[in-house]
């Protein structure tokens, strides 16, 4: 072991310190050839590395020239130190040679339990351990008088058959624990008992009142159908599904049949009423079809924009342009949109390969007025300014977009801007609406980024009206 690592009352003199570990020397030895002193253990560890030279002056060493230094050891053992448990509260101080004698009585020193249990604790905590915690201590049960070790007593405590305890059901009775089981099963008025009809358990003195209300209590069928008894909670299901004498509604009641008869007679009614039932179902299907169409129309109306602006994306532009070249006058239609809430209903159409004077060379764009839900509230003819824009998809951070834009005011004398009627809807020349057959040429549309990712964007905006007719 290296030198002593204790708390000294005064700093040890340098000549008492081991040059290798820097601590007061333990079992000091002296090299007689040079006079240097070291801890015996420190010097042995140094020499075990194969260096046979004095650590201080590097002179050759000979094991035969190394001797114990008892005089120096007496000086070291005479140094005054504090107890190794001083930080824990021990106030002892004295010569180093007396430390072991002090530790044999120090109340802070850790010692093994004298009962040979695994515990190791300070000497001052030993009495409490021996009295309360040691698993090897001896204890006697106050109820049965048996002698136990501490660990065995912990298992015995709380289960001793001779201990007097109260009934766990809180009936107030008190008896020895060994009599508790018999009391709980046959004597206690607060014991639980299962119901004879259901799986639930109840306190013994309330079981009778429950049985009169138990949902599994057998009761006779009120229709006297001959099945004997049925559990009370199953009676509604029995009357609905199983009772042969119960009155039931026709299975075609949802279709409109109001016939009601005993269940046994219902089969005959169904066989004899095939045609009336079929007619009812056909009428029901017709009504449902009308309701479905109305719901679809309402859903379409809800999905239509109502802010006077449409941004229409035409994807797969290259393929659709080739189709338009192969099929003259092939027209693409945008989703419908409203000029405003409760406003005019409009739609934009485009001829990717041109129409009229722009056929084969230009993109043509038109707008038409569609029949709307609020036409009777609006001013006619339609006279709001309309603006078309082919959007430049260039990155705004790199260059200012240059949209292609055209604006017009509808001619109030043109019939397509009059209030739509039921005659509208065909794709002849009169239903094209108004627009620009030469909106942009095929050459110009390929400039910049009007076509990007094989798609073009067309924006249509309408001047918002100030009011609707009152």
UniProtKB/Swiss-Prot annotation:
<keyword id="KW-0833">Ubl conjugation pathway</keyword>
<dbReference type="GO" id="GO:0050699">
    <property type="term" value="F:WW domain binding"/>
</dbReference>
<feature type="zinc finger region" description="TRAF-type 3">
    <location>
        <begin position="209"/>
        <end position="267"/>
    </location>
</feature>
<keyword id="KW-0217">Developmental protein</keyword>
<feature type="coiled-coil region">
    <location>
        <begin position="277"/>
        <end position="310"/>
    </location>
</feature>
<keyword id="KW-0597">Phosphoprotein</keyword>
<dbReference type="GO" id="GO:0007585">
    <property type="term" value="P:respiratory gaseous exchange by respiratory system"/>
</dbReference>
<dbReference type="GO" id="GO:0006915">
    <property type="term" value="P:apoptotic process"/>
</dbReference>
<dbReference type="GO" id="GO:0005886">
    <property type="term" value="C:plasma membrane"/>
</dbReference>
<dbReference type="InterPro" id="IPR012227">
    <property type="entry name" value="TNF_rcpt-assoc_TRAF_met"/>
</dbReference>
<dbReference type="GO" id="GO:0007165">
    <property type="term" value="P:signal transduction"/>
</dbReference>
<comment type="pathway">
    <text>Protein degradation; proteasomal ubiquitin-dependent pathway.</text>
</comment>
<dbReference type="GO" id="GO:0042802">
    <property type="term" value="F:identical protein binding"/>
</dbReference>
<dbReference type="InterPro" id="IPR008974">
    <property type="entry name" value="TRAF-like"/>
</dbReference>
<dbReference type="GO" id="GO:0045087">
    <property type="term" value="P:innate immune response"/>
</dbReference>
<feature type="modified residue" description="Phosphoserine">
    <location>
        <position position="426"/>
    </location>
</feature>
<dbReference type="GO" id="GO:0042981">
    <property type="term" value="P:regulation of apoptotic process"/>
</dbReference>
<keyword id="KW-0863">Zinc-finger</keyword>
<dbReference type="GO" id="GO:0008270">
    <property type="term" value="F:zinc ion binding"/>
</dbReference>
<dbReference type="GO" id="GO:0005654">
    <property type="term" value="C:nucleoplasm"/>
</dbReference>
<dbReference type="GO" id="GO:0045860">
    <property type="term" value="P:positive regulation of protein kinase activity"/>
</dbReference>
<keyword id="KW-0399">Innate immunity</keyword>
<keyword id="KW-0472">Membrane</keyword>
<dbReference type="GO" id="GO:0046330">
    <property type="term" value="P:positive regulation of JNK cascade"/>
</dbReference>
<dbReference type="GO" id="GO:0043161">
    <property type="term" value="P:proteasome-mediated ubiquitin-dependent protein catabolic process"/>
</dbReference>
<dbReference type="GO" id="GO:0016740">
    <property type="term" value="F:transferase activity"/>
</dbReference>
<dbReference type="InterPro" id="IPR001293">
    <property type="entry name" value="Znf_TRAF"/>
</dbReference>
<dbReference type="InterPro" id="IPR037307">
    <property type="entry name" value="TRAF4_MATH"/>
</dbReference>
<feature type="zinc finger region" description="RING-type">
    <location>
        <begin position="18"/>
        <end position="58"/>
    </location>
</feature>
<feature type="cross-link" description="Glycyl lysine isopeptide (Lys-Gly) (interchain with G-Cter in ubiquitin)">
    <location>
        <position position="263"/>
    </location>
</feature>
<dbReference type="InterPro" id="IPR002083">
    <property type="entry name" value="MATH/TRAF_dom"/>
</dbReference>
<dbReference type="GO" id="GO:0031996">
    <property type="term" value="F:thioesterase binding"/>
</dbReference>
<dbReference type="InterPro" id="IPR013083">
    <property type="entry name" value="Znf_RING/FYVE/PHD"/>
</dbReference>
<comment type="subunit">
    <text>Homotrimer. Interacts with LTBR/TNFRSF3, NGFR/TNFRSF16, RPS6KB1 and TGFB1I1. Interacts with SMURF1. Interacts (via TRAF domain) with MAP3K4 (via kinase domain). Interacts with NCF1, TICAM1, IRAK1 and TRAF6, and is probably part of a complex containing TRAF4, NCF1, TICAM1, IRAK1 and TRAF6. Interacts (via MATH domain) with GP6 and GP1BB. Interacts with EGFR (via C-terminal region); this interaction promotes the formation of EGFR asymmetric dimers. Interacts with PKM; this interaction promotes PKM kinase activity.</text>
</comment>
<keyword id="KW-0796">Tight junction</keyword>
<keyword id="KW-1017">Isopeptide bond</keyword>
<dbReference type="GO" id="GO:0005829">
    <property type="term" value="C:cytosol"/>
</dbReference>
<dbReference type="Pfam" id="PF21355">
    <property type="entry name" value="TRAF-mep_MATH"/>
</dbReference>
<keyword id="KW-0832">Ubl conjugation</keyword>
<keyword id="KW-0539">Nucleus</keyword>
<comment type="similarity">
    <text>Belongs to the TNF receptor-associated factor family. B subfamily.</text>
</comment>
<feature type="domain" description="MATH">
    <location>
        <begin position="307"/>
        <end position="462"/>
    </location>
</feature>
């Amino acid at each position: 072991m290296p030198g002593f690592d204790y708390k000294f009352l005064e700093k040890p003199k340098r000549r008492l310190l081991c040059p290798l570990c820097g601590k007061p020397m333990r079992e000091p030895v002296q090299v007689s050839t040079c006079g240097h002193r070291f801890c015996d253990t420190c010097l042995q560890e140094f020499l075990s590395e194969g260096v046979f030279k004095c650590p201080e002056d590097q002179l050759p060493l000979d094991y035969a020239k190394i001797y114990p230094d008892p005089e120096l050891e007496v000086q070291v053992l005479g140094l005054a130190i504090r107890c190794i448990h001083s930080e824990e509260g021990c106030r002892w101080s004295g010569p180093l040679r007396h430390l072991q004698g002090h530790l044999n009585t120090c109340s802070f020193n850790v010692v093994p339990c004298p009962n040979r249990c695994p515990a190791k604790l300070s000497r001052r905590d030993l009495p409490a351990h021996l009295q309360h915690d040691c698993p090897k201590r001896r204890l006697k049960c106050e109820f049965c008088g048996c002698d136990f070790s501490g660990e065995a007593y912990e298992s015995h405590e709380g289960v001793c058959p001779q201990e007097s305890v109260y009934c766990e059901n809180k009936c107030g009775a008190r008896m020895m624990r060994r009599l508790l089981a018999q009391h709980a099963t046959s004597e206690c008025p607060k014991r639980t008992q299962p119901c004879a009809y259901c799986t639930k358990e109840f306190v013994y003195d309330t079981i009778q009142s429950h049985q009169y209300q138990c949902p599994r209590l057998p009761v006779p069928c009120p229709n006297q159908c001959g099945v004997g008894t049925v559990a009370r909670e199953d009676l509604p299901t029995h009357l609905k599904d199983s009772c042969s004498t119960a009155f039931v509604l026709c299975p075609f009641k949802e279709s409109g049949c109001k016939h009601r008869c005993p269940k046994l007679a219902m089969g005959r009614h169904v066989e004899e009423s095939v045609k009336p039932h079929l007619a009812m179902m056909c009428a029901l299907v017709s009504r449902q079809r009308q309701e479905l169409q109305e719901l679809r129309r309402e859903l379409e109306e809800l999905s239509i924009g109502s802010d006077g602006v449409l941004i229409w994306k035409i994807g797969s532009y290259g393929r659709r342009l080739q189709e338009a070249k192969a099929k003259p006058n092939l027209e693409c239609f945008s989703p419908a949109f409203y000029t405003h809430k409760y406003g005019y209903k409009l739609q934009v159409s485009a001829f990717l390969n041109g129409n009229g004077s722009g056929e084969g060379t230009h993109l043509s764009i038109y707008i038409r007025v569609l029949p709307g839900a609020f036409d009777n509230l609006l001013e006619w003819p339609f006279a709001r300014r309309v603006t078309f824009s082919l959007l430049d998809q260039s990155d705004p951070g790199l260059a200012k977009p240059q949209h292609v834009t055209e604006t017009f005011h509808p001619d109030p004398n043109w019939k397509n801007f009059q209030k739509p009627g039921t005659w509208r809807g065909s794709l002849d020349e009169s239903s094209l609406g108004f627009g620009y057959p030469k909106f942009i040429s095929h050459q110009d549309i390929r400039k910049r980024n009007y076509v990007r990712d094989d798609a073009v964007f067309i924006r249509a905006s309408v001047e918002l009206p100030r009011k609707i007719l009152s």
